[in-house]
Amino acid sequence: MNTEATQDHQEANTTGARLRHAREQLGLSQQAVAERLCLKVSTVRDIEDDKAPADLASTFLRGYIRSYARLVHIPEEELLPMMAKQAPIRAAKVAPMQSFSLGKRRKKRDGWLMSFTWLVLFVVIGLSGAWWWQDHKAQQEEISTMADQSSAELNGGDANSQNVPLDTSAPVDSGTDSAANSAPTDTASTPTTSAPAQTPADNNAVVAPSQANVDTAGTAPTTPATPASPLPTDQANVTTPAASAQDLVMNFSADCWLEVSDATGKKLFSGLQRKGGNLNLSGQAPYKLKIGAPAAVQIQFLGKPVDLSRFIRTNQVARLTLNAEQSPAQ
């Protein structure tokens, strides 16, 4: 009898036995307790049998026991000594901080490396942009200088062309009129003097038309027959030279500044050509060309077109040399 009483007392001192006894006094089943505590029936059964589930942490088990005790009106102070035996608190294992510090140092090193990479990238982009801007600015300044130079040359050429007719028109017209008026009278009165007068006319064939007319007007009183013969002689000599095999032909589809010189260094042309204009230049090959707008000009050399596409694609001033023996070179 004493042994059975001792066993009953020991069982009553366990957490599960106290909870089961209180539940039975309230007339609750394990299913009802599980529903109220939102637990599985197996979990309630393990708590009453003083079993600790392997997949349940001790912290959660102690919380379930407290909830069960409040449900069946058992003070928690009575169960604390029993819970310490059934669900002892295990010391948490603190992982060393070495891995975190290593990761932090690695992250910091990666951040510095990424910052340096971005810095190098920005420097490269900045240098590339500065180089492009300087090159573009130099090309624009060169084109502007070429345009100013061509404008100055055109203005000077216009001034010279306006002054020449004013100086030579009066004597030429007067000489021509006097020679025309005196020619019929002189030829009728002295027919024998016209033959020897052809010799000075032949000698004066290389003189410009204006100079020939002035000279004949001055010598009309002494040799009346001379004015009639130089006129057809000078007109026969003023002819357009025949096209040479070394000719350089250029047609312009837009306004373009250019400069052309031959092998002797002589500038065959330097200035601005307007849209629709054309040039036919002759000189000693090779020719050196500098073209401000390559897209606005079409060039033929030795009867073959010259390819300027490489300058048109890059939108640069074209500098090239045209040789008679080889293809055009930049």
Curated annotation (Swiss-Prot):
Q: What is known of its domains?
A: The helix-turn-helix (HTH) motif in the cytoplasmic domain of the N-terminus is involved in the formation of spirals to maintain the rigid rod shape. As this protein is anchored in the cytoplasmic membrane, the HTH motif may contribute to protein-protein interactions to form the RodZ helix, which is localized beneath the cytoplasmic membrane. The C-terminal domain may be critical for determination of the rod shape by probably interacting with enzymes required for synthesis of the peptidoglycan layer, including PBPs in the periplasm.
Name the NCBIfam families for this protein: PRK10856.1 (NF008109)
Q: Where is the composition biased (Polar residues)?
A: 146-166
**What SUPFAM superfamilies does its record include?**
lambda repressor-like DNA-binding domains (SSF47413)
**What name appears for this protein in its UniProt entry?**
Cytoskeleton protein RodZ
Tell me the classification of the organism that encodes this protein.
Bacteria, Pseudomonadati, Pseudomonadota, Gammaproteobacteria, Enterobacterales
Gene that codes for this?
rodZ
Q: Which UniProt keywords apply?
A: Cell inner membrane, Cell membrane, Cell shape, DNA-binding, Membrane, Signal-anchor, Transmembrane, Transmembrane helix
Q: Which GO terms describe its molecular function?
A: DNA binding
Q: What function does this protein fulfil?
A: Cytoskeletal protein that is involved in cell-shape control through regulation of the length of the long axis.
| Spans traversing the lipid bilayer | 112-132
Q: Where in the cell is it found?
A: Cell inner membrane
Main location class: membrane
- Give all cystine bridges in this chain: none
